[in-house]
Amino acid sequence: MGIKGLTKLLADNAPKAMKEQKFESYFGRKIAIDASMSIYQFLIVVGRTGMETLTNEAGEVTSHLQGMFNRTIRLLEAGIKPVYVFDGKPPDMKKEELAKRFSKREDATNDLKEAVEAGDKDAVEKLSKRTVKVTAQHNDDCKRLLRLMGVPVVEAPSEAEAECAALCKNDKVFAVASEDMDSLTFGAPRFLRHLMDPSSKKIPVMEFDVAKVLEELELTMDQFIDLCILCGCDYCDSIKGIGGQTALKLIRQHGSIESILENLNKDRYQIPEDWPYQEARRLFKEPNVTLDVPELKWTPPDEEGLISFLVKDNGFNEDRVTKAIEKIKSAKNKSSQGRLESFFKPVATTSAPLKRKETSDKTSKAAAANKKTKAGGKKK
């Protein structure tokens, strides 16, 4: 679920903290990617028609492999250096949310059977997507694929979003990419949405800057975490009747959930019984993450390994895979060359060129005015 309604809340109240970027603008950047979220998107979108999905000869789904392979190549061709982060064991506080998701999938599965029997194609299309679940096998398949491609894989001890945020805070990567907004709540300095969008449409990447988010909302990081808990997160229920705008107003007015609870109209708002908001806050502030991450390395692809895994084991077209491997090799050479050039060339700050240009403009205008004065207004 992520943080309920946070994107709209930020668009309405902190628009300067968000900006659209071209995919290619992240050339040379290391990006930590929430792998499970990406796999889920691929399973829903790639090669799906109604209930039918891409499979190998054994009938095993391969949509996740097709999506991960193609998207990663596109990232590499754009000069982006992806790091895929996989979920570990979820926190105990997430069990209730996971149970809700399981129940929803069960309901969708039952509704899907009825839709199939009724021949309702639209309902089948919609409900089949709701039954999708990322399995351990899907994760293992993608880890193997990425390692064969020479792309680093990080296995988080717990939440992938928290691990991604930690990598970003420790300057191991430039930004975090996911569709769930949790990474901002975990304190990722830069967060990207739509980087991994699997649709054919070229959707711009939306970049969020957490420092600007706090500045625009006029909140501290602790207050922002409390705001996210009030909006609704994966770790506990929220207070019914309090949406994003009301939550923001209350946090600005009272400063913390404790103070809000002391002043809240109990007749109007029902506070969840034994509400574990403090534990949720602790999970956002002190998540279980890897303290000493090994050096992230991008290596040449294992050509034989890729052909064996994709072509022999999963029925991919050998000619296409061979061409894709050449793309990977070419992209990695291009990305490496770009890094070397940026290393040897001095990079000016963003403000410096603007100041120089402004000075240059003023000088030009002054020279033009001086020339006009000397000309004495003579007509030609």
Swiss-Prot record:
Cofactor(s) needed: Mg(2+)
Task: Give me the residues that bind DNA, please.
Answer: R71, E159, G232, D234
Q: Which GO terms describe its biological process?
A: base-excision repair; DNA replication, removal of RNA primer
Residues annotated for Mg(2+) 1 binding in this entry: D34, D87, E159, E161
On cofactor binding, the record's note says: Binds 2 magnesium ions per subunit. They probably participate in the reaction catalyzed by the enzyme. May bind an additional third magnesium ion after substrate binding.
Bias category Basic residues: which stretches?
A: 371-380
- List, in alphabetical order, the Gene Ontology terms for molecular function in this entry: 5'-3' exonuclease activity; 5'-flap endonuclease activity; DNA binding; magnesium ion binding
Indicate where this protein resides in the cell.
Nucleus, Nucleolus; Nucleus, Nucleoplasm; Mitochondrion
Outline the segment boundaries, as ranges, of region: Disordered.
351-380
List the residue ranges of the region (I-domain): 123-254
Q: Which residues bind Mg(2+) 2?
A: D180, D182, D234
User: What are the boundaries of the region Interaction with PCNA?
Assistant: 336-344
Biased amino acid composition, Basic and acidic residues: 355-364
| Domain of life of the organism encoding this protein | Eukaryota
CDD domains documented for this protein? H3TH_FEN1-Euk, PIN_FEN1
The enzyme's main class, written as a single word, is: hydrolase
What are the boundaries of the region N-domain?
A: 1-105
Q: Which UniProt keywords apply?
A: DNA damage, DNA repair, DNA replication, Endonuclease, Exonuclease, Hydrolase, Magnesium, Metal-binding, Mitochondrion, Nuclease, Nucleus, Phosphoprotein
InterPro entries, per this entry?
5-3_exonuclease, 5-3_exonuclease_C_sf, Flap_endonuc, HhH2, PIN-like_dom_sf, XPG-I_dom, XPG/Rad2, XPG_CS
Describe how it is modified after translation. Phosphorylated. Phosphorylation upon DNA damage induces relocalization to the nuclear plasma.
Family note: Belongs to the XPG/RAD2 endonuclease family. FEN1 subfamily.
| Role noted for this protein | Structure-specific nuclease with 5'-flap endonuclease and 5'-3' exonuclease activities involved in DNA replication and repair. During DNA replication, cleaves the 5'-overhanging flap structure that is generated by displacement synthesis when DNA polymerase encounters the 5'-end of a downstream Okazaki fragment. It enters the flap from the 5'-end and then tracks to cleave the flap base, leaving a nick for ligation. Also involved in the long patch base excision repair (LP-BER) pathway, by cleaving within the apurinic/apyrimidinic (AP) site-terminated flap.
Q: How does it assemble?
A: Interacts with PCNA. Three molecules of FEN1 bind to one PCNA trimer with each molecule binding to one PCNA monomer. PCNA stimulates the nuclease activity without altering cleavage specificity.
Q: What is this protein called?
A: Flap endonuclease 1-A
Native organism is Sorghum bicolor
What gene, per UniProt, encodes this protein? FEN1-A
